[in-house]
């Protein structure tokens, strides 16, 4: 089996995006916070599937 490394790029967190648009306070009023807080960590990587990669 082969290991493929996917480069990750840090994206804007949901918390930061909501704050920039002035929506964080409203979001906090109606949202429950899960035990695992992932609002401040967003990483993305491009994945290609198939031959040729698409």
UniProtKB/Swiss-Prot annotation:
Chymosin is synthesized in the mucosa of the stomach. The enzyme hydrolyzes casein to paracasein. This is Chymosin. Residues 1-27 form a propeptide. Monomer. It comes from the Eukaryota. Belongs to the peptidase A1 family. One of its GO terms (biological process) is proteolysis. GO terms for molecular function: aspartic-type endopeptidase activity. The gene is CYM. Its EC number is 3.4.23.4. It comes from Felis catus (Cat). Keywords: Aspartyl protease, Digestion, Hydrolase, Protease, Zymogen. It catalyses: Broad specificity similar to that of pepsin A. Clots milk by cleavage of a single 104-Ser-Phe-|-Met-Ala-107 bond in kappa-chain of casein. The keyword Hydrolase applies.
């Amino acid at each position: 089996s082969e290991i493929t490394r996917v480069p990750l790029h840090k994206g804007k967190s949901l918390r930061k995006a909501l704050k920039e648009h002035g929506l964080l306070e409203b979001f906090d009023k109606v949202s429950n916070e899960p035990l695992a807080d992932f609002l401040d960590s967003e990483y993305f990587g491009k994945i290609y599937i198939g031959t040729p990669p698409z």
